[in-house]
Amino acid sequence: MNPYAQYNPQERKVAYFSMEIGLAAELPIYSGGLGVLAGDTIKSFADLGIPAVGVSLLYKKGYFHQEIDTSGNQIEIPVAWDPSEYMTLLPEKITITIEDRTVIIQAWVYDVKGIKGDSVPILFLDTDIEINASQDREIAAYLYGGEERYRLKQEMVLGFGGVRILQLLGHDNLEAYHMNEGHSALLTLELMDRLQDIETVREMCVFTTHTPVPAGHDRFPKDMVREVFGENFDVESLDHDNIIDDQARLNMTYLALYHSEYINGVAKKHGETAQKMFPEYRIDAITNGIHTRTWVAESMARLFDRYIPSWPNDPSALRNALNIPREKIWAAHTAAKQELLDFVNERCGLSMQPDVLTIGFARRAAAYKRADLLLSDTDRLIKLVDTHGPIQILYAGKAHPKDEKGKALIKAIHEKMDAIKDKIDICYLENYDMYRAKLLVGGVDVWLNTPLRPMEASGTSGMKAALNGVINLSVLDGWWLEGHIEDFTGWRIGRRQRDEGEEPENSRKKDAADLYAKLEDKVLPYFYENREHWLDMMAYNIALNGSFFNTHRMVSQYVMQAYFQ
């Protein structure tokens, strides 16, 4: 029997394409928020019984294992893992043409089981087949590895190959092809080749953009596209509607926009930003969410089970968290905090204590996220501690191997850590992954987020923290513009928006000053002197933000607004 037949491909209605999908720490095929969002989305598909199928690439050499040396330099170590331990290799194979060579593609299927027993299969495409040329076997080896040409080949495998494998496996009744960012935009060309009708293709295509600035969108030189696509593809046919830009580059975002009936940003503010970037298209907004069962700490889950038993099926029921006795919330949080600190103390050689205010900052180490803002004035930080009480600081995050600014940021943080370590316990946890992320969002007291506005399209780590009753201290950007109620769900850093044309360095100084003021006037006094209000804020976070910012709500919006209009 064909192992894929159990998934009833004829009944699947939604195909969800993503360059990366984060499902569990042991599967090193994601790098950050985009992939984790994709994984959480598919988990909610399964929980809600949405007849979907996922499509991505299989990165046999994974995203890297991170080590940091004593000088703060990031060291990237390839990850060896065996997909056969987690997935089933399907017998079916398809071909695409790359540089006028035939490339054979196989697929591995991973089974995502929902809470009620429904399954969503994910097809991970793989070119590591003996008959392929050596350079083609490596196409899907590394996530976000290689140069532009390598990336274009990966996107061909995902877009062209993804549609072809779906057809071969019997997915004849798909009604929606959802592109999670522009990496999979080439699927629109494959659909056009098959259907020969732009309106039919548009009715089937949904495009979610995550990038709030023009520079972040994938572009490939037209001459390179011509060479890689091969002589049978007419690149000039794409030279319309900004798909080929004024620098003769294929713009994957415009390719997806042109072919999609429904387009959305990932938060209300980001939807407005995207609408200004692409005024010729109608851009909606569906704010991101998180998969609650994946991200809630075990101790907090047990608390919810007792007081809100319907929460796993209906996260909106978490609004009833206001009725949970505050001492029970604190006990559950303390258990999660102790689990985190045990992990940290063992790895960092520290003796962090559960009664000390603990601040967490963990996310991709990109320069715009300004992870070092908290350490920009170490003298003031030490004075705060001497005056108002101790703090503990936890950092984590990988920089992309080619992101020199991100690597420099990690190094700068380590240099600042050396300056304060005698006064403040501080640790940069190596090899940030989903396991460490869950410990951190469940166990710290304050979740810090300091991006340069308006660079944060949404962000989801703060949602995970809020679900666990952890209080956010964040720049007003992305989702926090919707989740923030000052002194109730957390605190804002800086003004609502950056002044037009304001230099980043000036914005940095203002935000740093406001961050220290919030620590001095609100965070430390509330934690050490007004625990009753602190506990109320924890409950408000769960009830107001945990109940709304979840992928069950998000997926329901996609179903109603995008997939089955």
Feature names for model-found ranges:
Residues 1-565:
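Catalytic cores of carbohydrate-active enzymes across secretory and cytosolic contexts
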